[in-house]
């Protein structure tokens, strides 16, 4: 399930993050330092040292906004969110086809995190660069994603994906992973559809007893499938 989440950050917040990243100096490092053995040969970008002060400051802002975003909560059903990381692609940079590693070590507390969901939060205006599309492969084909600054996409971390070469400008983004309460993507998709249907029924004033029954079914499925 690939889900677009608009306006995770507003224009002012995007500007604040971008300003901090643009003045990060030596905190920008070769992106291959965190790549696995299969990703390193095809990864050509820069990223912020995830333990740097600028990373910690930007992480707090993004995590705070995610906690208050109903669409993110509904789609991801997050259990643990890996602290957001930040990358930069200039002209000629790319990240070839790869699958994200299955387990990450939390940089702040050492916990192991299962990467159920991958997330990319775009921080550059979509018309400020050419190329740089996030391409995600699933059973229905290839999906090309290029969103405006402040918008985010989440998709199964099991997906083969890539970032196409930059031919003009610079693409800055945040990326991270989520260990969901529901590890199975099909089950998450079903619960996401149910939650959306419930919200629409609430807006239309549909039969209250029927809505309560549907809400009960949602929570009973969540109770049956979730891992905490």
Swiss-Prot record:
Its cofactor is Fe(2+); L-ascorbate. PANTHER family: PKHD-TYPE HYDROXYLASE YBIX (PTHR41536:SF1). Its EC number is 1.14.11.-. Keywords: Dioxygenase, Iron, Metal-binding, Oxidoreductase, Vitamin C. 2-oxoglutarate binds at residue 171. Disulfide bonds: none annotated. Gene3D superfamilies: q2cbj1_9rhob like domain, Rabenosyn, Rab binding domain. It comes from Cupriavidus pinatubonensis (strain JMP 134 / LMG 1197). Binds 1 Fe(2+) ion per subunit. This is PKHD-type hydroxylase Reut_A2877. One of its GO terms (molecular function) is L-ascorbic acid binding. Pfam families: 2OG-FeII_Oxy_3, PKHD_C.
């Amino acid at each position: 399930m690939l889900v677009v989440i608009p306006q995770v950050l507003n224009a002012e917040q995007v500007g604040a993050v971008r300003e901090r990243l643009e003045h990060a100096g030596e905190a920008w490092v070769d992106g291959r330092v965190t790549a696995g053995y299969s990703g390193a040969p095809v990864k050509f970008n820069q990223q912020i040292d995830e333990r740097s002060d600028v990373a910690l400051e930007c992480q707090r802002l993004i995590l705070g906004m995610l906690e208050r975003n109903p669409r993110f909560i509904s789609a991801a059903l997050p259990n643990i969110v890996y602290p957001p990381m930040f990358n930069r692609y200039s002209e000629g940079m790319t990240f070839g086809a790869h699958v994200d590693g299955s387990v990450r070590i939390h940089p702040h507390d050492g916990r192991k995190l299962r990467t159920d969901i991958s997330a990319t939060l775009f921080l550059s205006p979509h018309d400020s660069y050419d190329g740089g599309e996030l391409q995600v492969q699933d059973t229905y084909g290839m999906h090309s994603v290029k969103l405006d600054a402040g918008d985010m996409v989440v998709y199964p971390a099991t997906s083969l994906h890539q970032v196409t070469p930059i031919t003009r400008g610079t693409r800055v983004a945040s990326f991270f992973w989520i260990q969901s309460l529901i590890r199975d993507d099909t089950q998450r998709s079903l619960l996401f559809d149910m939650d959306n249907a419930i919200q629409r029924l609430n807006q239309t004033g549909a039969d209250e007893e029927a809505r309560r029954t549907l809400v009960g079914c949602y929570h009973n499925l969540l109770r049956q499938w979730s891992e905490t």
